Amino acid sequence: MCTFGRELFPALFILHMKNEELTIAYALLSFEELPADEQALVKLAEEATQTSYAPYSHFHVGAALQLEGNVRIAGSNQENAAFGAGTCAERSALFYAHSSHPEAAVEAIAIAARGTNGELTDCPISPCGICRQALLEAQNRAGKPIRVLLCGKRHIVRLTGIENLLPFAFNEIV
């Protein structure tokens, strides 16, 4: 039997690597179980779906941010025929918040959506990868975890810390 060197066949040694696990911490809640401030944030996200411009996907997303100092900001997805030129609700809210309140840390975000039938989605939706990265940047600037409320009619998922949405995040430029 041959003995292969790691330097010659590194892919073969993947089989012998130690497996690791990640745990994602979240709570599954009803709207009524949320504290009043989070209920208000969810309602604002739901309202923001009404300002969405989604003539192509017909999927209307709203996001609401809670900033330091009890400031709330809402944003919605804005589509464009040149698909890459559109903006997600989460980034609309984040970028407006930072441009209008640059020193205020983001404390929480609620995200809600209306499907093609015009109704709020039964199940929670979650941010795309680009929005997750933008949320991580906001969390890094704030220096503390952001609470995330993923909203659906059936239940709401609450996470604390963007790392629970984005394991193995791109976290710094060397």
Annotated model-derived regions:
Residues 41-54:
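Short, basic/aromatic recognition patches
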Residues 56-58, 87:
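Short glycine/proline-enriched turns and hinge-like loops at secondary-structure junctions
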Residues 74-174:
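Zn2+-dependent cytidine deaminase-like catalytic core
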